Design a protein with these regions (language model features):
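Hydrophobic residues in beta-strands and at strand termini
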Residues: 49-51, 108, 154
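HotDog/MaoC-like acyl-thioester-processing domains
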Residues: 1-12, 110-164
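Exposed regions on extracellular, virion, or secretory-pathway luminal proteins
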Residues: 39, 60, 109-111
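A conserved, well-ordered hydrophobic junction motif at loop->secondary-structure transitions
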Residues: 41-42, 46-82
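Conserved beta-strand residues within beta-sheet cores
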Residues: 27-29, 48, 101-105, 119-121, ...
């Protein structure tokens, strides 16, 4: 697994997301990585997250909206990482390659227990310059609890506040 999280390479001006922004101390601060040294579109991405009690749906189980948020942020982070790799650029170099969610589809497979560390695995389905499709599985205790598909598109210049 790589040592620097994808989200930690985002410019400070683009690091306020509630789900994964390093500058949002109230948020989840999800951290995504390459699962191995195979850092390409055939590689897998990974993240871990342990839900706090405030994300309880009913006693003992995680709120589904949290799972959707984690899938979303792991998908867009994975999209950014593969875009940098495809461009033969180091993650975090300017101009930024940030992706935003164009579509998110989540299926809840099994109840997600509280108290367990969640593991998110991202698999690339489609990789293009301005569009990346990532399939994400969320597991707890080695049981798949949710699956999601993120269609991530390159962030339009109108959303960028970074001067290169």
């Amino acid at each position: 697994m790589s040592e620097v999280a994808f989200q930690d390479c985002y410019p400070d001006e683009l690091s306020h997301c509630y789900g994964c922004g390093k500058n949002n101390t109230a948020g989840h601060q999800l951290k995504s990585y390459w699962q191995s040294d195979n850092q390409n579109s055939q590689g897998l991405t990974i993240a871990h997250y342990t839900p706090e009690a405030c994300y309880t749906a009913i006693p003992g189980f995680v709120y589904g909206g949290l799972l959707a948020s984690l899938i979303d942020c792991h998908g867009t982070g994975s999209a950014a990482a593969v875009a940098f790799q495809q461009a033969n650029r180091a993650m975090g170099t300017l101009p930024p390659l940030r992706f935003v969610t164009a579509a998110l589809n989540v299926s809840y497979i099994a109840p997600t227990p509280m108290g367990a560390e969640l593991e998110l695995i991202g698999t690339f389905i489609e990789v293009k310059e301005k569009k990346v499709v990532v399939e994400i599985t969320v597991s707890a205790n080695n049981v798949i609890c949710a699956k999601g598909t993120v269609i991530a598109v390159k962030m339009p210049d109108s959303m960028l506040n970074v001067k290169c």
